[in-house]
Amino acid sequence: MRVELQVGFWAGAFLLLVLLLWLFSGVLLPFVAAVVLGYLLDPVVERLERFGMNRLGATLVIMASFALLLTLLSILLVPVLWRQLSSFVEALPGYAVQLQGLISGEIERLSREYSGGLIEKLGLGKDAGAEFASATNDLVAQAAHWAGSFLNSVLTRGAALINLISLLVVTPVVTFYMLLDWDRMVATIDGLVPMRHRETVRELAREIHTAMAGFLRGQSLVCLFLGAWYGIGLSLVGLNFGLLIGIMAGILSFIPYVGSLTALILSATVAIVEDWPRWHLLTLSLAVVLAGQFLEGNILSPKLVGESVGLHPVWLLFALLAFGSLFGFTGLITAVPLAAAAGVVLRFAIARYRESELYTGETSPDPKLLLKTARKEDR
């Protein structure tokens, strides 16, 4: 009964935590960003401490260096990115119209060339090409309208401005205190763990730390590289909004599959609209994106991230959808590290289950009976 009460208590505590996170999901992003930054920068602070600096001084040095780096990036990149984003939002309706015209023209051309041949063999009517073109145009128009509305709301809505301000103001403050009190917080949490299970929990925490640290630090470097690769590469080949597309794809590369799809779809769309019917710009843009994907899949991720996550792609997709539906964009960002932590706990639970009486079917001997037997043997 005691075990059942413990299981019920921890299950209830977990459900309560999930409920609270879901209720406050709208304000979690700056705090999650601060925790991630604190987690990534804490080893640097500890290294400075080993050189003789105290915790406060090391934290101030790290935060000042980080603020200087962000300031330089803001001066160099933010004005350019803002101009490109504003221009992209303005050009998006025109791009949609041009893309509709290109798709309609190509479908009509193909339907004329293959009329009486392939279309009739497939059992389609004479107007199948026009109907397909109309449906495709409607889909493109709807997607362009949705994307334009979303980007316009990002630029104009007060909520987006508040979120941006909270990221710029709240995140550095919380990160500073996280770095300053990191060891104290870890010690406090460790002291709250029941003594009977402390070593087990510590072992689990070490495995979770290995999985999460490997992913967060490795994937952050991958995102930095891909953002620079896409942004510089697409700009050099002459793609309009190349820097914006590259930086956006680099940031979204923290979410598996999303960054690569963003780079591929946006670069191909802009290249087709700007350069059709020539293939020169499209070929160069796709070469940049595919080369980045090759480097990520065969060199960067194996070297920097490795097998630290240990999740099957199906479970990875499930984690993205589940956390994204519960916590929005914050859930998408945290889905992989949290799923990695859940995987460690699940593997531990399976291992304990295989050692249990329920799995083996063997009843463990009564300790009192063992003690009596040992005493008889001693006599």
Language model features: what each stretch is:
Residues 27, 39-40, 75-76, 89-90, ...:
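Hydrophobic alpha-helical transmembrane segments of integral membrane proteins
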Residues 23, 208-366:
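Alpha-helical transmembrane segments and their immediate boundary loops
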Residues 53-54, 194-199, 308-314:
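Juxtamembrane helix-boundary/capping and inter-helix hinge elements in multi-pass membrane proteins
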Residues 29, 33, 73-77, 104, ...:
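Alpha-helical transmembrane segments and their lipid-water interface positions
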Residues 1-83, 87, 159, 170-171, ...:
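Anchoring transmembrane alpha helix of integral membrane proteins
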Residues 4-6, 57-60, 146-270, 279-281:
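Alpha-helical transmembrane segments and their immediate interhelical loop/hinge regions
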Residues 56-69, 108-128, 211-224, 274-277, ...:
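Juxtamembrane/interfacial segments around transmembrane helices
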Residues 8, 44-51, 57, 64, ...:
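Juxtamembrane membrane-interface segments in integral membrane proteins
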